[in-house]
Amino acid sequence: ADWRRREPGRHARSAFRAAAAAGTLTLIAGFWLLTPGAERLRDFKPSEFKFLSQIQSFPDTRVVATSTDIRGRVDRVESPHLRFAPGLSLKHTEPLPPTTVVLTDGDRPVFLYDRHSAAEVLFARDTLSYAGYELVDRPGSVLILLSGGGLAVPCAIASGADRIRILHANPQVADLIRTHYGLPVTAGNPRSYLTQS
């Protein structure tokens, strides 16, 4: 019966040692992942079915910037072959402006349209997305809840709105949009933003 009696606190000490060993191993693995030797493990090659893999098959397409955080990998891709204008009228005959695409984890494209002149975004007036702006003469302010696509931004610019604010959930993508368009962009959850404003 003596073997059943255990030393008080022995179980707690064993659990503490096990937790300390696991924590130490986790820290060592984490630091190792930051070394140049582990770069192959950190960099992933996207699946052939991802948008990033598909557009990289176009000539003169290049990934110009890549960043990674807890929300995923964000790539900015430039190509002379990228065009995005869903719902474009068949009557539109002018060439579309060049675009840059921002991809999260190789998918979820957000297209950023060239904006060297106001005329370059006027193509948006010939899209179905612009129909709402036809109902209002010139909107005072526009809030764009942007999760993908990106056509909403040139539509708002083409409408001549006085104030345009863009909201995107991913801070990395929000920074790229802000830098590209020079418009106010907020990173965050749309519901939280709307309840606070």
Region annotations inferred by a language model:
Residues 7-24:
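Membrane-interfacial entry segments at the cytosolic side of transmembrane helices
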Residues 187-197:
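Conserved SAM/SAH-binding loop
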Residues 1-6:
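Membrane-embedded alpha-helical segments of integral membrane proteins
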Residues 24-161, 167-188:
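Class I S-adenosylmethionine
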